[in-house]
Design a protein with these regions (language model features):
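Peripheral terminal and linker regions in Fe-S/redox and tRNA-modifying enzymes
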Residues: 1-259
Length: 259
């Protein structure tokens, strides 16, 4: 079966050893590369599921989430963090990705910048993230991620895994000192000009007509277009359901499926 996770990833369970390489190879022509972070590495980056189509959003954060993903995957073998790192991007509407409870939470602002919370998290010793930046330039996102990794590697707990998440740096350093050290590392990271981003959200040119009244239908900011919510119980999907979804989506021009 397949499991849709809270970090917007898809897990495949109960596979045999022979099935794994076959699935990995078959996924390549579909644009799915089965590489990612696990263990003491970055986790899948979250973004508001309706970013780019949600009424009232500040802007579409998907390009920045994708750029952050590629950057973290490119360096994850070269860094040694105490524990995992969770990053989320919110489009500025309802914060369904809970940015204040992430190691890094970027919240889009109407002026094109981000508000940034750091060192938050649930679980044992939970902490609300501390506000590290009010108006972070969107082009500088990767510098802030690099700064957090450096800070985590410098001040994270390598001896006790139960206290090895970024939120515990609020205890060891204190919120104000953590913010100061973090911003100092961000400034140092800016020596690498290659991390500067120049991104533009993709334009949606598809149009629609008519209206749809259904409890699972969500009106997009594009007139006449809708998103449809489907929430499998416990996030579990049987393979047959994916086939049904694929058969349905293949009949709808310009649509996409998001986790």
């Amino acid at each position: 079966f397949l499991k849709l996770t809270t970090c917007e990833a898809i897990q495949m369970h109960d596979l045999t050893p022979d099935e794994v390489p076959a699935i990995m190879e078959a996924a390549i022509p579909c644009g799915i590369i089965t590489r990612g972070g696990g263990g003491d590495n970055p986790r899948n980056i979250q973004a508001s599921p309706l970013t780019g189509v949600q009424p009232g959003e500040a802007f579409d954060v998907m390009p920045w989430a994708e750029a952050a993903t590629e950057y973290l995957l490119s360096i994850c073998r070269d860094i040694h963090m105490p524990r995992k790192l969770k990053v989320a991007f919110c489009n500025g509407v309802d914060d369904c990705v809970h940015t204040a409870f992430r190691d890094m939470g970027f919240v889009a602002q109407p002026d094109g910048t981000f508000k940034l919370y750091i060192a938050g998290g649930l679980g044992g010793g939970w902490r609300m993230g501390i506000l590290a930046a009010e108006s972070l330039p969107a082009e500088d996102v990767l510098y802030y991620i690099r700064g957090m990794i450096t800070t985590f590697c410098q001040h994270g707990n390598y001896q006790n895994r139960a206290k090895a998440r970024t939120r515990f740096m609020q205890e060891t350093l204190g919120p104000d000192e953590l913010r100061r050290v973090f911003l100092e590392n961000v400034a140092a990271a800016k020596a690498d000009e290659s991390l500067k981003l120049h991104l533009t959200p993709a334009a949606i040119t598809k149009t629609g007509t008519g209206t749809l009244d259904d409890p699972r239908a969500i009106a997009q900011k594009q007139p006449g277009l809708y998103a449809v919510a489907y929430h499998p119980i416990g996030g579990r999907l049987i393979p047959e359901k994916l086939v049904q979804l694929d058969n349905l989506l293949s009949t709808i021009p310009g649509c996409e499926c998001r986790v």
